[in-house]
């Protein structure tokens, strides 16, 4: 397990909604890549227990999506709270990237960071203050070179580990087809 300052930490959360003042994290997954986006390790994929009362606050889209994926059942059966999920995730990350070195990486990652700040501050603090947000490139490509977007295929399972893998692949796609190196 080579600890390396240049490794990148990718994270995805599934939540009961988009408002960190009202909604909660129900799944977290992480993976680590090297600086060239080769996946080095996949961290734990953790369903986080939330009460039926909290789950009942989900809108129709979240109920439909997270029920179809099996996540709602996994959340109900989980014995993990946010603190336990943070401990497992930090233990994994410490083997790959020193604290404060990696930007937080993912798609629309600012949204995830808002939830981390609210519910998992120790994990949020592990990241460098910078962001590596793949959705920035998606928005630029949409405006500057929209024809390349048709070559990008995503499954949109809204399962945390699948979503991270797709984010890494999406950044690699933009590197090949959009960014001139």
Swiss-Prot record:
GO biological process: DNA metabolic process
Gene3D superfamilies on file: Ribonuclease H-like superfamily/Ribonuclease H (3.30.420.10)
Keyword set includes ATP-binding: no
Catalytic residues (positions): 129
Taxonomy, superkingdom: Bacteria
Stretches assigned to the Exonuclease domain: 8-171
EC number: 3.1.15.-
Keywords: Cytoplasm, Exonuclease, Hydrolase, Nuclease
InterPro entries cross-referenced by the UniProt entry: Exonuclease_RNaseT/DNA_pol3, Oligoribonuclease, RNaseH-like_sf, RNaseH_sf
Compartments where found: Cytoplasm
CDD domains on file: Orn (cd06135)
Molecular function terms, GO-annotated: 3'-5'-RNA exonuclease activity; nucleic acid binding
A single GO cellular-component term on record: cytoplasm
SUPFAM superfamilies: Ribonuclease H-like
Protein family: Belongs to the oligoribonuclease family.
Record function comment: 3'-to-5' exoribonuclease specific for small oligoribonucleotides.
Protein name (record): Oligoribonuclease
Lineage: Bacteria, Pseudomonadati, Pseudomonadota, Gammaproteobacteria, Enterobacterales
């Amino acid at each position: 397990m080579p600890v390396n300052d240049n490794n990148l930490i990718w994270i995805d959360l599934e939540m009961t909604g988009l408002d960190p003042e009202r909604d909660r994290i129900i799944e977290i997954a992480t993976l680590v890549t090297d600086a060239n986006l080769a996946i080095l390790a996949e961290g734990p994929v953790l369903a986080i227990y939330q009460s039926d009362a909290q789950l009942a606050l989900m809108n129709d889209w979240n109920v439909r999506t997270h029920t179809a994926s099996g996540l709602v059942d996994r959340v109900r059966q989980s014995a993990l709270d946010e603190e336990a999920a943070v401990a497992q995730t930090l233990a994994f990350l410490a083997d790959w990237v020193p604290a404060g070195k990696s930007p937080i990486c993912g798609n629309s990652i600012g949204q995830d960071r808002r939830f981390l700040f609210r519910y998992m501050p120790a994990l949020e603090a592990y990241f460098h203050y910078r962001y590596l947000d793949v959705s920035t490139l998606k928005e630029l490509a949409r405006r500057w070179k929209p024809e390349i977007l048709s070559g990008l295929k995503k499954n949109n399972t809204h399962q945390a580990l699948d979503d991270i893998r797709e984010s890494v692949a999406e950044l690699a796609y933009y590197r090949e087809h959009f960014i001139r190196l």
